[in-house]
Amino acid sequence: QGSVGASGELAPLSHLFLPLIGEGEFRFKKNILPAKKVLKKHDLLPIQLRAKEGLALINGTQFILAHTVIGLNKMKYLLDLSDVSGAMSVEGFQGSTAPYKKALHTIRPFKGTIKVANRMRGLLKNSQNVLSHQGCGRVQDPYSIRCIPQVHGASRNAYQHLNELTEIELNSVTDNPIIISKDEAISGGNFHGQPLAMALDYTSIAASELGNISDR
């Protein structure tokens, strides 16, 4: 029941949408039950598909798109949590907030980096531990402390890129062929998952980098 994502998500979507027409099975309250039984229990009738609707249900990117949305929600939580973890590390290390100053990041204005630097300043505002760094003879903090905006920020950039692509895909038509009008149908490749797949790979690397710098 796997899929390659190169011709829609035919296998998983076929299983997923069978219950809509009264076929297949539902996972209902930890039990696997026939779809017809569950529909009847809830006074629901199976959908009567019309021309091309069955193909539209299974020959698209809905499966990879659903996983992308779930992944984005988890990534957003991970990004925010990583900033908090980073700020706690700075406090525990009695580090300096100088690497998070606005002036430093306006001259290399990546959106993600600026966002993280702003968050770090806010999280560490009035920190008594950090204030103890003032007058310290140590010239610079370790890379993993100083480079939090750059590393976390790069991961945020990847997240933002994937988020933009996902918004486009959520509002797109991805089945095939496409009926343009009563007299015109176009066979194309909107079912191909590459626009999301490539960005997902890239964002997976970005997520793992959050763990790498935290481990340092």
Give residue spans per PLM region.
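Active-site cavity-forming subdomains of large catalytic enzyme subunits
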Residues: 1-107
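Small-residue-enriched alpha-helical segments and adjacent helix-cap loops
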Residues: 14-15, 208, 215-216
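Accessory "access/gating" subregions that flank catalytic or transport cores
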Residues: 90-212
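Short, flexible micro-motifs
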Residues: 8-11, 196, 214
